[in-house]
């Protein structure tokens, strides 16, 4: 077996059971991985310098193919109503078959860390069949110093083999695609999909399992920090604006997707960003646009001109879920440490497909807990398999239910205590539709959202007049300099006022119906923060 690159020979592939490999390339850098990816025909070089790969059939995550081993560790700690299980015996067979499948292969190995705070990070080794996958995960996780690689011992090991096909009868799964996690052995097996995002979300899921026991709240969020050290956290599902809104030139970027909130403050889990690029423009998002085109960026399913190799971010013919992975330091104002103090503001982003939520609302602590557990947004086409071309309303607990091994109330109660302890202001922001529901109205102008967020984060929004929303009970500003007053009250943007009322009542009913599963698990003040039952659809 040929090996190249810096590595810990005392803890090599044999420790994972890998054998009879053709070669292993350890901890290769960007240029070398470009060479292998291009030589292997895995990807193409774009005119501006980014590497572009296609993921084929799978252009998003496959949540129905994700499994966790149910054993003594997880039996009482996992939420099995929202997570699928396999037995230790089934995982052992699957693991052995992965090892067998890898024989004769050339693998790429990266030794990385999940978590910017050394006290809470997890050392992660990732074996990939594809060179571009190795570049992707090297970009997305945090890289240790080169000197640390010689004695690197992983706590978590991931092996990603897109050419592997699971056998449902043999492995206890539903299809040839599989993402299987064993928290006891700290092993993740990914097969049957080229979608690189499965790797990063597997690390996130692992941290979501272990960190609560260490007093750290793991969060599906972006985060940034102001000049005065005032950190802000942005919750939201894919497509709600986490990446876009946290990339504020006036604030330092911590990260765009995954963070922990611990005793010392907020810290990024990652070392890169994973931005949606559909209709990305330099005019609207210059920092993300430039970062996505530079040498070292990895593009997924973006259309590239076959002659000029120019990138077309407006073309969604392959998928709406086109993506760019780029290192955090590609953003001019990114934090070099990935760490900040305690947050001053929490923002919950919702892409409201019904167009009835206001562009911004201030939440009480109880309302914040309610909306965090509700996790309302709209699924956007392409970020998961099986969705049509239209967004679908979704309630995803903690704005990240697919990644939560434990019961959502574990994370919700942690958030509530942290908000109270640090006196955090909480906001709900609609980045979805205004002037009507999807298909009738328009997407909320990003300039309006940015203006409202700036006012919230700099404290000036505390000094304006608020009204109480008749449907949801939260406080909504009535006017703000530089923002059209009509847009602040959604009914004013609808041509058909009766249809607005009917649609708002329907959404109230959806909120209340969704929350029934939490009613016996939360305090009375959180229940009282629900939308007004009298406004629910009859």
Curated annotation (Swiss-Prot):
- A GO CC term assigned to this protein in UniProt: cytosol
Q: Which Gene3D superfamilies match?
A: 3.90.228.20, Phosphoenolpyruvate Carboxykinase, domain 1, Phosphoenolpyruvate Carboxykinase, domain 2
Reaction catalysed by this enzyme:
oxaloacetate + ATP = phosphoenolpyruvate + ADP + CO2
Cofactor binding note: Binds 1 Mn(2+) ion per subunit.
Q: Which GO terms describe its molecular function?
A: ATP binding; metal ion binding; phosphoenolpyruvate carboxykinase (ATP) activity
Query: By its UniProt entry, which InterPro entries does this protein fall under?
Result: PEP_carboxykinase_ATP, PEP_carboxykinase_C, PEP_carboxykinase_N
ATP-binding: is it a keyword of this entry? yes
Name the principal localization, coarsely classed.
cytoplasm
The record's EC number reads: 4.1.1.49
Q: Where in the cell is it found?
A: Cytoplasm
**Cofactors that this protein relies on:** Mn(2+)
Q: Which family does it belong to?
A: Belongs to the phosphoenolpyruvate carboxykinase (ATP) family.
Q: What is this protein called?
A: Phosphoenolpyruvate carboxykinase (ATP)
